[in-house]
Swiss-Prot record:
Subunit description: Homodimer.
Cited Pfam families: URO-D (PF01208)
HAMAP family per record: URO_D
Organism: Polaromonas sp. (strain JS666 / ATCC BAA-500)
Marked site: Transition state stabilizer: 78
GO CC annotations, alphabetized: cytosol
Subcellular location, record wording: Cytoplasm
Keyword annotations from UniProtKB, A to Z: Cytoplasm, Decarboxylase, Lyase, Porphyrin biosynthesis
Record-given protein name: Uroporphyrinogen decarboxylase
Sequence similarity: Belongs to the uroporphyrinogen decarboxylase family.
Organism domain of life: Bacteria
SUPFAM superfamilies attached to this UniProt entry: UROD/MetE-like
NCBIfam families according to UniProt: hemE (TIGR01464)
Length: 369
């Protein structure tokens, strides 16, 4: 059904297998910083018009790959498609971000929540299949979802938030309601990601964008536990091929040790984390060893080309030399930003970044020890 994969560097790095260079892709790589994306978005008329149209979603997913030699594509969609399918009424006002018409703020609203019919998300799965075919084996396709906790933040707040007052009020006043919501969210996310895998996704990523706003014990109880519930239900392989699972928690560096116990292959790190220390704690060998992904500050891309190259080298050097033994797994690194790329990023800066990653990481492997 799909063309053979020509560049499997990203997938091999996810599975802690030796690679010739460090693979690179960027969170939000298909996005507003690209003029061609803005043109397609204008034709679509709205963000949801873009995300729910298979042809448009395919077009914008491939746009960054036409410009840059990236090592993976990521589905163009939004993390809030799942609560939208639950009937919360998602909309995007220009310049304001996502908003739900019917937020979940009381016992009755929580009681009405249920895992949505995946048929309501058919447009996402059709896009996955269309993108996979259009890639024609060039690079792997990553599917994704928001984490149960991050979805709950939007579902309760009704939009983005500066202080998370409403969702944290529910968490502390009615933890029973929060647990009910998170359980439904976790089972919905698992079903959603499994359907993406069935449709052609070759890896899946859970974005816990707001895990870092939680207090220490609350993170383990209300975020990590439900991310683990999702991972426990995900397909490990499809058509005999392993499907790597990636988890990214923005602000989660302090919980790296706890996150290492997650049943996944890759941990994504934001720019506040020291890669060398992360490798020493969870990236070497052992029962919970993980591939690491990250973690350049996205604002580096506003610097000069020479400074971008310097900062890229610093991230690669911080992780250190990946292992070179193709006969066994070992420490591996996937280069990414520490969060999504800014819409204001000059497109030429991304070209500098990608070329710097490939060039410097090859030279690191060429050094004899």
């Amino acid at each position: 059904m799909f063309a053979p994969l020509q560049n499997d560097t990203f997938l091999r790095a996810c599975l802690r297998q030796a690679t010739d260079y460090t693979p690179v892709w960027l969170m939000r790589q298909a996005g507003r910083y690209l003029p061609e994306y803005r043109a397609t978005r204008a034709r679509a008329g709205s963000f949801m018009g873009l995300a729910t149209n298979t042809d448009y979603a395919t077009e914008v997913t491939l746009q960054p790959l036409e410009r840059y030699p990236l090592d993976a594509a990521i589905l163009f969609s939004d993390i809030l498609t799942v609560p939208d399918a639950m009937g919360l009424g998602l909309s995007f006002a220009l310049g304001e971000g996502p908003r739900f018409a019917t937020p979940v703020r009381d016992e009755a609203a929580v009681a009405r929540l249920e895992v949505p019919d995946m048929g309501k998300l058919r447009y996402v799965f059709d896009a996955v299949t269309s993108i996979r075919k259009a890639l024609n084996g060039r690079v792997p396709l990553i599917g994704f979802s928001g984490s149960p906790w991050t979805l709950a933040c939007y579902m309760v707040e009704g939009a983005g938030s500066d202080d998370y007052r409403l969702v944290k009020t529910m968490l502390y006043q009615r933890p029973d309601l929060m647990h009910k919501m998170l359980a439904v969210n976790a089972d919905a996310v698992a079903a959603y990601l499994n359907a993406q895998i069935e449709a052609g996704a070759q890896a899946v990523m859970i974005f816990d964008s707001w895990g870092g706003v939680l207090a220490d014990a609350a993170f383990q109880t209300f975020s990590l536990a439900y991310t683990a519930r999702v991972l426990g239900q995900l397909k490990r392989e499809h058509d005999g091929v392993k499907i790597p699972r990636l988890v990214f928690t923005k602000g989660g560096g302090q919980w790296l040790q706890a996150m290492a116990a997650l049943d996944c292959e890759v941990l994504g790190l934001d720019w506040t984390v020291n890669l060398a220390q992360a490798r020493a704690r969870v990236g070497e060998n052992g029962p919970h060893a993980k591939a690491l992904q990250g973690n350049l500050d996205p604002n580096v891309l506003f610097a000069s080309p020479a400074q971008i190259e310097t900062e890229v080298a610093a991230v690669l050097d911080s992780f250190g030399r990946p292992h070179l033994d193709s006969s066994q797994p070992g420490p591996t690194h996937i280069f990414n930003l520490g969060h999504g790329i800014s819409q204001h990023t000059p497109p030429e800066s991304v070209e500098v970044l990608v070329n710097a990653v490939h060039t410097h990481s090859r030279s690191m492997r060429a050094v004899r020890t």
